[in-house]
Amino acid sequence: MNIALIAHDNKKKMMINFTTAYELILLNHQLYATGTTGKRIMEETNLKVTRFQSGPLGGDQQIGAEIANNRMDVVIFLRDSLTAQPHEPDIQALIRLCDVHMIPVATNIATAEILIRALERGDLDWRERVKERG
């Protein structure tokens, strides 16, 4: 499955801890991330990550395009809800696209752990059938 990993600056360490803890599960999937998040994940784990632009430079929109074209299956977006983000409209658009296209999305670590366990159990295999139908 194709998994997008995004983390605001104050959540990047949490994303590194998450990807380290679940590295064995994530190794079986194609990973995509915004620029700095992807770089940090690759520096600290053995995971291969396809990187888009940094979020404020359009990375969120690039991932949104993948969602709109049915090429993303799961989005894990560790948001810093306590800090104003200059690209907040892009963030809202990304979450809206997940809702419209029925893409499971986690915006905090608790939900991310639920999604990763569901992925491990095969609970999200229905996404493959959705992609086949196009």
Swiss-Prot record:
Lyase is among the record's keywords: yes
Protein biosynthesis found in the keyword field: no
InterPro entries: Methylgl_synth, Methylglyoxal_synth_AS, MGS-like_dom, MGS-like_dom_sf
EC number: 4.2.3.3
A cellular-component GO term for this protein: cytosol
Single GO term (MF): methylglyoxal synthase activity
UniProt-listed Pfam families: MGS
Residues annotated as domain MGS-like: 1-134
One GO BP: methylglyoxal biosynthetic process
Top-level EC class: lyase
Catalytic site positions: 60
Amino-acid positions noted as binding substrate in the UniProt annotation, renumbered to this chain: 8, 12, 34-37, 54-55, 87
UniProtKB keywords: Lyase
Superkingdom of the source species: Bacteria
Catalytic reaction annotation: dihydroxyacetone phosphate = methylglyoxal + phosphate
Family the entry assigns: Belongs to the methylglyoxal synthase family.
HAMAP family: Methylglyoxal_synth
Known role: Catalyzes the formation of methylglyoxal from dihydroxyacetone phosphate.
PANTHER family found in the cross-reference section: METHYLGLYOXAL SYNTHASE (PTHR30492:SF0)
Protein name: Methylglyoxal synthase
Protein's organism: Alkaliphilus metalliredigens (strain QYMF)
Lineage of the species this protein comes from: Bacteria, Bacillati, Bacillota, Clostridia, Peptostreptococcales
